[in-house]
């Protein structure tokens, strides 16, 4: 289980404690409310918290019980969308409240700490998705992710043009024939893959039975969780494609080298990765008719019109992805 007090450097922990607000909350205190956008990211310093979501019938469903070092509220911060669950203390607890405005400024103020923070958030979400994959199949629903357009753009909305160019230099085109398998659960993941075209099915073996837990579409990464684990545990799921895919196969060693040498790039890359995984986690819940109050809050929101800044960001992200696709699909180096 993820524990920030173990995972984070002493320097980052000191910065968080100096800039956050410590509060002691009694048993039964609601820290985050499903359906509302959280103004803080929270770190549990001591105690215990429960994470409960709402199903389509309005009943509470427990997602997790978390202990010291847990981080909550990061999904709402990353996506600027309503929280998918209530977070309630299960015992008297000490909680560190981190303002989202403060965290947004960290990139400019402390780029190396920002890169470490974003990587920790990505690792936390990776652990969350791995846990979620183990039980999400128990809930009925269409089982298809919501709003694929968001996923196409999320990586390229955070990265800049030079970042995308740098990633392109690390990659080559790979085609997966219809019905073939890209990754097998538990086996080594030699590269990171960006879907340029097609769709991937994600399967997890649970007690000897393969269960489909999601899909990934163009603009998403595959194999990215291996960047976030301290030990080589192999692929967390099997990835196949019914109709075939075109992928940008990214050299993992080159990518890790660039991430370690360039804090600003690492900050943007891990934030984009976290946004993608946050959406993946949210979509799994929504596809199984969970996070009902969050879904309702977004449906009731009349402020769906995008401002010029958002439209500009979407346009730039789309252009970056289109340029990358053109570069490789029109004659780049190909691997079958």
Where are these regions (language model features)?
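Cytosolic regulatory regions built on CNB/CRP/Popeye-like sensor folds
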Residues: 1-336
């Amino acid at each position: 289980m993820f524990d920030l007090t173990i995972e984070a450097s002493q320097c980052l922990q000191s910065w968080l404690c100096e800039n956050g607000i410590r509060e002691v909350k009694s048993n039964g205190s609601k820290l985050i409310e499903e359906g509302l956008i959280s103004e803080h990211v929270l770190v549990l310093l001591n105690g215990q918290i429960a994470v409960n979501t709402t199903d389509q019938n309005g009943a509470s469903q427990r997602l997790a019980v978390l202990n010291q070092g847990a981080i909550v509220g990061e999904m709402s911060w990353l996506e600027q969308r309503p929280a998918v669950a209530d977070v309630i203390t299960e015992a008297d607890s000490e909680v560190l409240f981190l303002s989202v405005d403060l965290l947004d400024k960290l990139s400019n103020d402390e780029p190396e700490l920002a890169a470490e923070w974003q990587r920790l958030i990505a690792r936390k979400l990776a652990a969350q998705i791995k846990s979620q994959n183990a039980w999400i199949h128990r809930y009925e629903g269409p089982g298809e992710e919501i709003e694929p357009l968001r996923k196409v753009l999320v990586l390229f909305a955070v990265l800049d043009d030079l970042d995308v160019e740098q990633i392109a230099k690390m990659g080559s085109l790979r085609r997966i024939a219809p019905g073939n398998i890209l990754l097998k659960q538990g086996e080594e993941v030699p590269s990171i893959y960006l879907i340029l075209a097609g769709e991937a099915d994600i399967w997890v073996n649970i007690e000897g039975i393969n269960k489909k837990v999601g899909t990934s579409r163009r603009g998403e990464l595959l194999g990215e969780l291996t960047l976030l684990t301290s030990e080589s545990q192999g692929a967390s799921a099997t990835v196949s494609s019914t109709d075939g895919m075109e992928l940008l196969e990214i050299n993992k060693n080159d990518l890790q080298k660039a991430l370690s040498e360039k804090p600003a790039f690492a900050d943007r890359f891990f934030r984009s990765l976290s946004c993608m995984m946050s959406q993946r986690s949210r979509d799994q819940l929504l596809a199984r008719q969970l996070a009902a109050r969050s879904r309702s809050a977004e449906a009731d929101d009349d402020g769906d019109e995008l401002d010029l800044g958002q439209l500009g960001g979407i346009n730039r992200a789309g252009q970056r992805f289109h340029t990358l696709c053109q570069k490789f699909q029109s004659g780049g180096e190909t691997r079958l």
